[in-house]
From Swiss-Prot:
Keywords from the UniProt entry: Cell membrane, Ion transport, Manganese, Membrane, Transmembrane, Transmembrane helix, Transport
Organism of derivation: Bacillus thuringiensis subsp. konkukian (strain 97-27)
GO MF, one example: manganese ion transmembrane transporter activity
Coiled-coil residue windows: none
Gene from which this protein is expressed: mntP
Function: Probably functions as a manganese efflux pump.
Any single Pfam family the record assigns to this protein: Mntp
Subcellular localization, as worded in the UniProt entry: Cell membrane
Family of this protein: Belongs to the MntP (TC 9.B.29) family.
Protein name: Putative manganese efflux pump MntP
Length: 182
């Protein structure tokens, strides 16, 4: 994989991880122990590996069977997901956040990684390298979740919505780029 191929994946990994970062900011404002913060970040990272992997496998199958239609659908999926993230982050009300423990941690990690499934589906259609992509998505999401949790301990929610909006705009941009390559 060349450096030029790696840069878009890194940017996309940050776009996907912004959801975990934003939610972690709010969660970090609670009294969490360092061990809890580390565990939450690792769990989010693992889900950001599993979800795009499943999406990429499914995307490759669709690509082999449906070719150009799958290519177009993958781009539209990224654009739609990006707009949805922007829309929902602008309109969502501030909800009560609880510390995820046990099953609720898995539900939480699944919730913030569901968009990586869709992106994985699109990347699978385009034939992206699976191992590098999923490890990058997982690692960046874990780091962003930890960053959000630690910043949240010190700041009172300055970036939450804005982080999600930026992530959504980046996904829209990549979807448009796939539809209309420069």
């Amino acid at each position: 994989m060349t450096f030029e191929q790696l840069i878009p994946l890194i940017i996309m990994a940050f776009a996907l991880g912004m959801d975990a970062f934003s939610v972690s900011l709010g969660m970090g404002m609670m009294a969490l122990k360092i061990r809890q913060i580390l565990y939450i970040g690792v769990t989010i990272g693992i889900f950001h590996i599993i979800m795009p992997f499943i999406g990429m496998v499914l995307g490759r199958v669709l690509s082999e069977q449906y070719g150009d239609i799958a290519h177009f659908a993958g781009a539209i999926l990224l654009i739609g997901l990006g707009f949805y993230i922007v829309y929902s982050s602008i309109l969502e009300n501030e909800e009560t956040r609880t510390t995820p423990i046990g099953i609720s941690l898995f539900v939480f990690a699944f919730g913030v990684s569901i968009d990586s499934f869709s992106v994985g589906l699109s990347l699978g259609i385009y034939g992206a390298q699976t191992i590098i992509t999923i490890l990058l998505f997982g690692f960046v999401s874990m780091l962003l979740a930890w960053t959000g949790l630690f910043i949240g301990r010190h700041a009172k929610g300055m970036l939450g919505t804005y982080g999600e909006i930026v992530g959504g705009i980046i996904l829209v941009g990549f979807g448009l780029y796939l539809l209309f390559p420069i």
